[in-house]
Amino acid sequence: MNAGTNAAGKVLVANRGEIAIRVFRTLRALGIGSVAVFTDADAGARHVREADEATRIPSYLDIDAVIGAARATGAGAVHPGYGFLAENAAFARACAGAGLVFIGPPATAIEAMGDKIRAKQTVAAAGVPVVPGRDEAGLSDDELAAAALDVGLPVLLKPSAGGGGKGMRLVQDAADLPDAIASARREARASFGDDTLLVERFVTNPRHIEIQVFADAHGHAVHLGERECSLQRRHQKIIEEAPSPLLDEATRQRMGASAVAAAKAVGYVGAGTVEYIVSADRPGEYFFMEMNTRLQVEHPVTELVTGLDLVELQLRVAAGEPLPFSQDDVVLRGHSVEARVYAEDPARGFLPTGGRVLALSEPSGDHVRVDSGLDTGTEVGGSYDPMLAKVIVWGADRAEALRRLDRALGSYTLLGVGTNVAFLRALLRHPDVEAGRLDTGLVERSLDELTGEAAVPDEVFAAAALERMLALETGDPDPWAIPDGWRPGTPARTPWIITPSGGDPVEVSVRGRAHDAEVTVGTTRTADGEDAANGEGAAGSESAAGSESAAGVPVRASLRAEGPGLSLTYGGRTASYRAAREGHTLWLGRGGHTWALTEHVRAEGGAAAAVAGDGVLRSPMPGTVLAVKVAEGDQVDEGQPLVVVEAMKMEHTVTAPIAGVVARLPVRAGAQVALDAVLAVIEAEEG
């Protein structure tokens, strides 16, 4: 690349995590200096270390601070990544006003496409098909509800000012409209600072297919084929691929030409993505949804099938260079699939998780790419989007790519933070996914099936108990010093109470030593260590000789340390686990699955009731208390909303588990809470 690409030879990346590192990689390859910005929460983050230099800012949304950082470091250009300020027209103008090159489209194009109402009107005038709906600005709640009924249910409520699924609501019943509108406005305001909504007809069996476009400042524009993005949860993509298994070449070219027309309609320059909704039943019919005026999260799949570096193209176009190829030069080769690794728990409604990365092993190999912002020690909190990394593969055909991605995810181990990796593997193996029969509702319809493996296997409980035995073994020949339940004249057992994350305590009894034991995975326990059936004691205590847990069958097992992990033989089968410990919690990982297992600590007061299923309300995720809807002493009904918890701009309403009176309310709005923190205690009324 010539020196004119950036006169200062330095680019500031106004972002964090994996996308910042991704941009740094291309800058480094081109010999261009890189500048990172970071907040206090990210002071030790990997993207800070990977840049040539870094500077602190109070917020990634602080335009003045970002401009000031660029000036202070001598950067001549700013790459916004995606999210944060990437689609902020005021930021693009501020860069231009400061003499900085904004590596993105003109502010006028951002404004035209950033407002969904204006965008639909603009592209419709250019002949691009749009979904039937109402897109006037300033519609009141009543007008929105009336518009929804006019368009015809089901409808989608969508924020005008932003995308990514935030603030989007599917409404199928007129009675749900008031609550859906209020919730969508609240989330849109929190995410984009604008609660304007539009309403569109919901296309049945919809597929989400998008076209990558590129335009230069010389009037040239091309498309780089499509990406299939139909596999989503909560309107957010989790697996993307290129090309789409639905489209034939003729439809691909029609959609591509339509996307180029949309870009030209707003004088677009740079990388952009035109998103379409396509009926799986009628693939030749497609409708414009929106245009993202930035690099997309899923851009790597396009890179792998075209052989192009899209960040390099962004840099060249921003420097005023013409596109180095024409539409006829664009050829798609093979197939690429990407899976997004999120800090979330699919079995609990995809609620965000968090924590510190204790151990990390990311996949590698031929045609396997990982875009990641993680490192061992990284703190994953609730301040930012829960996406941690992307695993991207290429194959000669779709079947090969799917197999390669499944194998890659099987070798992905992250301990310390719960992720969706095992869920992604289950999704890739779904018969409809393998056959290419995709639509945006597939994940929701198949959720029970896809999370069926979420239950902790008995052998994992066994490994956790034996790991504690192994840690306590001293090598002392005195039988009294060995934690194997030994007593003169009779065999005994050592019971451990192990609690999986988000689950109930389970008793695991061990007779023998870690290398040669008989293990029984038994009944669920109450929080104070009592078993309703036999009243046995708490973790680590000695129980009566010969007593077995009613729910379990004794199994021969042995455990030994093996490098950074453990090797367990259980019932004649041997498996290796990656292991890491944090306090009383042991993390185990294998085949993309991870388990957090906490050795029981006797609970106090009302906390014990939570496990017993009484009136204790616990936080389903780490986050911030957004609203408390009751006060101590209030009478509440079962299922009544009591507390709203927010994490990563997602709200979750926690309801009363029983009817009764609010006895304790230890939290208030604005409080930070951990996973399973007590939010309220409800006492059932007597009689």
Feature map (PLM): residue ranges:
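Short acidic-glycine loop/turn motifs at beta-strand connectors
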Residues: 173, 215-220, 278-283, 364, ...
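Short amphipathic alpha-helical segments
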Residues: 9, 166, 243, 385-391, ...
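Structured functional modules or segments
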Residues: 606-687
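N-terminal beta-alpha lobe that positions the nucleotide/phosphoryl donor
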Residues: 1-274, 278-299
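Residues located in well-ordered beta-strands
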Residues: 198, 578, 596-598, 624, ...
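Catalytic P-loop NTP-binding/switch module of NTPases
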Residues: 574, 578-619
